[in-house]
A protein has these predicted regions:
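Conserved small helical "lid"/interfacial subdomain of P-loop NTPases
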Residues: 208-262
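Conserved nucleotide-sensing/catalytic segment adjacent to the nucleotide-binding pocket
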Residues: 133-179
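C-terminal lobe helix-coil module of Hanks-type protein kinase domains
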Residues: 1-27
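N-terminal pre-Walker A segment at the start of P-loop NTPase domains
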Residues: 56-86
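Walker A/P-loop nucleotide-binding motif
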Residues: 94-110
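Extended alpha-helical coiled-coil/bundle linker/stalk regions that scaffold oligomerization
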Residues: 246-507
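Long C-terminal appendages of very large multidomain proteins
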Residues: 404-631
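Regulatory extensions appended to serine/threonine kinase catalytic cores
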Residues: 26-36
Length: 631
């Protein structure tokens, strides 16, 4: 109790008060009430809203503050850094730990975990780190190595910070330890300056990243690149950061007060939370959410940070609405001022919809909305969703969630042909059907992968995690698709060669190609194994490259794989299809075309080919039919 007048005067007085309580009146709700250092109770809904990057209520929760909130601790998700690197630091294995990554990757949060296992922790007055000791070794932390400190310029700050390591080859010999979060570019710029006496460390870092971690680091040094962390990568317990964070933010102990709320059965926030923390079906719903997020990871358009992840989950749970806002929305529905279908947009399964009020400007949510599952048609299923009553037997069974939306959906599903509907009812009808589709994706009992916008996603996932035999088959498949994109559809030649058109000019009479032996190429998953021993990593792309000239390589993302998969099945892309995001394919082709060549293949109809070859010794040109023996 924080107020002196409310405290018991003595232990005896407290005991007498306790004895007056009937033990049958005691109730263990499992609810945790969290108060801040002023004694004020913290609202979980307000806290969740503060995590959303575009919150109208303030987004203070998106950044690690100088003082950690109780709910920050309660919802903190342990990562591999906490589980593996933390113990290695505690055991004295590393004296210098450098952490790079984007803003929001959790660098500061981890450094604070290190400080949490240390002794004699003293925060620096500049609020950019602390001094402490681990096993008697003095340490200093720096939360942001790119900023100036008080009257000192950044170069001066870094010079002093790295001073214990000047001239060392074995960093374990340093008398003091350091842990720093810093932008990789800024770090290398500083270290490469000869006057800073750290050019050797700059070379080590550069070689380490260039050789994808296969260059050995000096003893006592660890470099972590959080840009390689994936929020959908699974650990040994089959949990991802996404799954762990959802479970933390929807933990039942944090949401106990919702059970006695008068609007509990109609509140979309409670429905969302109860769905995701359900003991029976919650994990399955989260798995389907993981596949949706995995499409973003595999597209490689955005590195999803912990801040992005928490912002996304927050928006999915509350849509930036407070408890008072929910009451007002339900009153608007009751007063016919807001259509029920529009209120449905607030449920978690409509996270890929952009029809709620103003579209979100959060960068991850925008990508999710561009990948809307409601835009994928499955006629046989859609027909039943639109024209039949939805049956409980066709959906997941929830253990503790009390509310089902199916009766509400059935009641609102007015079946009229399009010609009988005005613009308003037609708009609501479309919104209703899209809600049915998205709800069915997350809670329906069926092959949900068919609803994902990328039909090759499952196959791509399998290739990324396949064996060497699978990779060899995939290499031939990709090479054939690239050949097809150049007009080389002949499977006999493409079985062993990659074909590239020798000219961009359309010839109405014939085609000409350069061929490259597939044995000169290799295909591998972008694993970065040596760089990710302390972080969650999931292979997100394939690397198709020349064995000798490794700079000639093509990074195959999900978008490109989907396009090549379509091409292999007969789709003939236009020039516009291959422009823009597929510019890397054109760069790869250009690099191959730049190699010296002495042969061209020509054909009138892509069936009968002729070889036109230059003899380098005699300088004579030989023309001969291409037969199967020369393939």
């Amino acid at each position: 109790c924080t107020k002196r007048e409310d405290r018991f005067a003595s232990a005896l007085e407290m005991q007498e008060a306790l004895l007056k309580i009937d033990e049958n009146a005691l109730y263990n709700s499992g609810q945790v009430t969290i108060i801040d250092n002023t004694g004020t109770e913290l609202s979980i809904v307000d806290y969740i809203n503060s995590l959303y990057s575009q919150s109208s209520h303030g987004n203070a929760g998106t950044r690690a503050g100088w003082k950690e909130l109780a709910l920050d601790k309660a919802t903190y998700t342990q990562t591999r850094l906490d589980k593996k690197l933390l113990s290695a630091i505690k055991d004295g294995k590393y004296r210098l730990v450098i952490i790079t990554g984007n803003a929001g990757d959790g660098k500061t949060a981890f450094i604070r975990q290190v400080e949490g296992i240390a002794e004699n922790v003293e925060k620096l007055s500049n609020r950019n780190g602390a001094i402490f000791s681990i096993n008697g070794v003095p340490f200093q932390s720096n939360y942001d190595g790119s900023q100036d400190e008080e009257e000192r310029a950044n170069d001066e700050v870094l010079t002093e910070f790295f001073k214990p390591f000047e001239g060392l080859k074995n960093y374990s010999e340093a008398k003091e330890g350091r842990i720093i979060a810093i932008n990789e570019g800024r770090l290398v710029d500083f270290l490469q300056e000869p006057t800073n006496n750290h050019t050797n460390l700059a070379d080590i870092i550069d070689e380490y990243f260039y050789k994808e971690g296969y260059a050995e680091l000096p003893e006592g040094l660890m470099i972590i690149n959080l840009n390689l962390r994936s929020v959908t990568a699974k650990d040994e317990n089959n949990d991802s950061l996404l799954r762990s964070q959802v479970k933390k933010l929807t933990d039942k102990s944090l949401w106990g007060k919702c059970n006695v709320c008068p609007i509990a059965e109609r509140c979309f926030i409670k429905y969302n939370v109860d769905t995701l923390n359900d003991s029976a079906a919650g994990d399955e719903v989260i798995s389907r959410l993981e596949w949706l997020i995995r499409t973003i990871v595999y597209k490689r358009e955005l590195h999803i940070t912990i801040r992005d992840l928490r912002s996304f989950i927050a928006y999915m749970l509350t849509r930036d609405q407070s408890c008072d806002n929910v009451v007002q929305l339900l009153q608007a529905v009751d007063n016919k001022e807001l259509e029920e279908e529009i209120y449905w947009e607030l449920y978690y399964f409509n996270i890929s919809s952009n029809e709620w009020r103003l579209p979100s400007q959060d960068r991850l949510i925008k990508l999710i909305q561009e990948t809307d599952i409601a835009q994928v048609a499955i006629p046989s299923i859609d027909r039943d969703l639109y024209f039949k009553n939805l049956e409980e037997d066709d959906y997941l069974i929830f253990e503790s969630r009390k509310v089902s939306l199916l009766p509400i959906f059935n009641e609102r599903n007015i079946r009229k042909i399009v010609s009988e509907q005005d613009k308003g009812s037609l708009r609501l009808s479309k919104a209703r059907h899209k809600s049915f589709i998205r709800h069915h994706y997350f809670e329906g009992q069926y092959d949900f992968m068919k609803r994902l916008p990328y039909q090759s996603l499952g196959k791509f996932y399998g290739k990324l995690n396949g064996n060497e035999v699978d990779m060899e088959e995939t290499k031939h498949s990709l090479a054939y698709a690239i050949s097809c994109s150049e007009g080389g559809w002949n499977k006999d030649i493409s079985a062993n060669y990659l074909l590239l058109s020798s000219t961009q000019i359309k010839d109405p009479f014939s085609s000409s190609y350069r061929r490259f032996a597939l044995s000169d190429f290799e295909l591998l998953a972008n694993k970065n194994e040596k760089l990710v021993q302390f972080i969650e990593h999931e292979n997100d792309s394939l690397i198709f490259r020349h064995k000798e000239n490794k700079y000639i390589q093509l990074t195959v993302s999900l978008d490109l794989y989907e396009m090549l998969d379509y091409i292999e099945r007969g789709f003939n892309p236009s020039i516009n299809d291959l422009r823009g995001r597929f510019i890397e394919l054109q760069v790869f082709k250009n690099l191959l075309q730049s190699k010296v060549h002495t042969e061209l293949l020509v054909a009138r109809n892509n069936r009968k080919f002729y070889s036109i070859k230059l003899n380098a010794e005699t300088k004579k040109i030989h023309i001969e039919p291409l037969n199967k023996d020369s393939l």
